Every structure is written in C-alpha cells, then in structure tokens.
Regions:
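Short beta-strand elements
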Residues: 27, 127-145
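Ser/Thr- (and often Asn-) enriched beta-sheet segments in non-cytosolic proteins
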Residues: 36-38, 48, 99-103, 120, ...
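A short, structured loop/turn motif at beta-sheet edges
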Residues: 42-45, 72-74, 108-120, 145
Length: 145
C-alpha cells in the first residue's frame, strides 16, 4: 500500500510541477521586483522604453524581451523587442538595474507595430534560471505617450 501511495504521489508531482512550477516560481522567487517603465522617448518613428527594476537572482541568464501590444480596435499582437543585448546571453549582479533602450520593431518587420499614442504595452523578460522551464518577469502595462 505504501509503495502505491509513493508511486501515485510521484506521478502527481511529475505532472504538476511542470504546469504549476513557473507560476509558483514567479510569485515566490522572482528574478525582478519593483519593475517599471521609467521613461519613453521618440527616436525617429519608434518609441524607446527605459526600465528600472530590482534584480534578485544573479544565476539567471537573460534570454530576450517580448512585448504584448494592445491597440484600440485591433487584435492583440506580440513582438520580439530590440534591446542592446539582443542575441546575447547575459547575467547581471543583484541590485537596482536600469535597462533600455527597448524598441518594438516597425513594419515591414512581420512583428512590426506602429506605436501610436494610447497603445498599451506589457513587456515579458525571459530568463533561464534552470533547465526545467524559462522564468518570466512581467513589466507593465504602460501606455505609450
């Protein structure tokens, strides 16, 4: 009987951890806290965003940034964000961090979006902290000025 209970518990854990693990990790052991967009700047026909956050976990490697873009009367879009570290894997020490310039690509890029005033942007920064799953940090939403 005891062996069966251990086997059932192992199966439940094996099925639950990959599903619930990322959500639990983000709440209990986040990579970034107090993250917010602290500035926007119009550069040509793009908007550049600057971000401030408190870095908590130095072992996590930066992967990329994705933006969820919501515009009035249009379907929600997702775009890979251009950052100074695009294409590079980096890790920063714990403490207050300033990040940017982050730019959402413009058309004709397939991910391109015209960032008009009133557009709502939410950034998702992806980190690799271990081999089980990627860890996400959410920043925003913020309204484009």
């Amino acid at each position: 009987m005891r062996i069966e209970l251990v086997a059932v518990a192992s199966v439940v854990a094996a099925l639950t951890i990959p599903i619930a693990g990322p959500a639990i990790e983000v709440r209990t052991w986040p990579v970034l806290t107090d993250a917010e967009v602290i500035g926007q700047e119009k550069i040509g026909d793009q908007v550049s965003f600057r971000v401030e956050a408190m870095r908590k976990r130095p072992s996590c490697m930066y992967q990329d940034v994705v933006a969820k873009i919501e515009q009035q009367g249009q379907a929600t879009k997702t775009a890979e964000v251009e950052t100074p570290f695009s294409g590079r894997r980096i890790s920063r020490p714990p403490g207050r961090q300033y990040m940017g310039s982050w730019k959402v690509p413009k058309p004709p890029n397939p991910d391109g979006v015209d960032m008009t005033p009133g557009t709502i942007v939410t950034f998702f920064v992806r980190y690799q902290c271990h081999v089980l799953w990627d860890t996400m940090a959410r920043i925003g939403p913020v309204r484009v000025e």
